[in-house]
């Protein structure tokens, strides 16, 4: 039954209930349920290692963590390329082999907790023009990431 026909027949309660149910389901869909494994490197890994890893794995970003697994920052391949091409960091291979990636991270890293609703993560990504966002547990340890592709995979079922 269409919405217009439901209104004519006095069936607005049925439509309202289903809308409330959908809204509730959207709020209950958390990042923990849909997140992907994080592309992760240690903060002491060299810039050269990270550049090679991004190219070899065909990744567009990596999350940088410390020795406890806590999120330190995020490095996007395009941002790293811009740093190198604009000569903000030395292009010398020897230099890139000894300088840690922590020197090129985006700080502070934007992150959400595992229990954050997916809609909140999607809103943050759109607001801050990010393709992905880190997901951490209550201790701040990196547990995964959510991307536009994840959002596109899970939210359309609520819209149709």
PLM ranges: what are they?
Residues 1-160:
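Tandem CBS (Cystathionine beta-synthase) repeat/Bateman regulatory domains
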């Amino acid at each position: 039954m269409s919405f217009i026909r439901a209104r004519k027949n006095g069936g607005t309660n049925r439509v309202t209930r289903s809308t409330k149910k959908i809204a509730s389901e959207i709020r209950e869909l958390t990042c923990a349920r849909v997140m992907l494994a994080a592309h992760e490197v240690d903060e002491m890994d060299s810039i050269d290692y990270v550049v090679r890893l991004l190219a070899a794995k065909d990744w567009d970003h990596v999350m940088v963590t410390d020795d406890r697994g806590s999120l330190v920052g995020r490095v996007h391949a395009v941002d790293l390329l811009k740093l190198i091409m604009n000569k903000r960091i030395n292009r010398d291979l020897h230099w890139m082999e000894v300088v840690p990636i922590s020197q090129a991270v985006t700080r502070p890293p934007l992150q959400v907790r595992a229990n954050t609703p997916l809609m909140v993560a999607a809103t943050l990504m759109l607001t801050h023009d990010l393709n992905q966002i880190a997901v951490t547990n209550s201790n701040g340890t990196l547990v995964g990431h959510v991307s536009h592709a994840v959002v596109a995979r899970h939210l359309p079922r609520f819209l149709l």
